[in-house]
């Protein structure tokens, strides 16, 4: 999605890595650790996302986000944005800091997500507690659930659209049409790879964890 936006004339900040993530990321990572202090772990796979919805956002958090986004916020480009996966961990306060921007919620089948590694695989790296496990796929699945629960608890912003990776790959023209109507400007057509779809059928991905089932059904994925 980031590459599509960049090729469509959206300034995505600078510099970017090969995945289209805005660099350097350290300020965003530190911001994630700050918001985690105010999300109590209830035990099991439950967290209390209530406090961060209404509390005053710490000045330190705002400073970190503004510093991370300095090239985006300071750009005169008519269309601006950014992408880095860890934004999701900060979503409640990002939504409140930037209530009028247009959000694109990029969703992927969690069974495919957990076949590969991500920086958020171990939530403890960002100060988030969860049941300890040596099973790397279970850790990844817990991280996916946490992030999905966090977004659901926070609710949609004023302007938001959900796009499933699978739909974008298999029905690119249809999904680009939805996005063009939502964003209000034409989007570039770039080649997309189909191999990320159904990866859990070809690579080790652990079991189908029961705690993922409700969210998979919510997003329209087969069980």
Task: State where each predicted segment sits.
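Glycine-rich phosphate-binding loop used to anchor ATP phosphates in small-molecule kinases
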Residues: 59-93
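PAPS-dependent sulfotransferase catalytic core
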Residues: 1-63, 195-199
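Surface-exposed cleft-lining segments at the edges of enzyme active sites
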Residues: 75-80, 120-140
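PAPS/PAP-binding and catalytic site of the sulfotransferase fold
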Residues: 1-10, 94-98, 162-187
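Short catalytic/ligand-binding loop motif for oxyanion handling, primarily in non-cytosolic enzymes
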Residues: 2, 21, 88-91, 111-116, ...
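Soluble or luminal CAZymes and related metallo-dependent hydrolases
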Residues: 56-64, 83-86, 136-147, 171
């Amino acid at each position: 999605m980031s590459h599509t936006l960049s090729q469509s004339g959206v300034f995505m900040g600078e510099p970017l890595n090969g995945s289209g993530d805005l660099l350097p990321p350290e300020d965003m990572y530190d911001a994630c650790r700050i918001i985690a202090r105010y999300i109590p772990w209830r035990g099991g796979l439950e967290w209390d996302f209530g406090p961060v919805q209404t509390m005053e956002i710490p000045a330190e958090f705002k400073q970190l986000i503004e510093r991370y986004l300095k090239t985006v916020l300071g750009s005169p480009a008519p269309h601006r944005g950014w992408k880095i996966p860890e934004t999701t961990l900060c979503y409640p306060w990002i939504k409140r800091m930037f209530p009028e921007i247009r959000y694109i919620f990029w969703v992927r089948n969690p069974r495919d997500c957990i076949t590969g590694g991500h920086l958020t695989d171990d939530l403890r790296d960002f100060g988030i507690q969860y049941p300890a496990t040596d099973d790397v796929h279970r850790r990844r699945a817990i991280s996916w659930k946490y992030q999905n629960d966090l977004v659901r608890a926070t609710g949609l912003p004023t302007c938001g659209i959900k796009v499933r990776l699978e739909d974008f790959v298999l029905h690119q023209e249809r999904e680009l049409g939805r996005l063009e109507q939502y964003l209000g400007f034409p989007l570039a057509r770039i080649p997309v790879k189909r191999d990320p779809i159904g990866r859990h059928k070809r690579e080790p991905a652990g079991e189908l964890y029961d705690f993922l089932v409700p969210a998979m059904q919510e997003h329209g994925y087969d069980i």
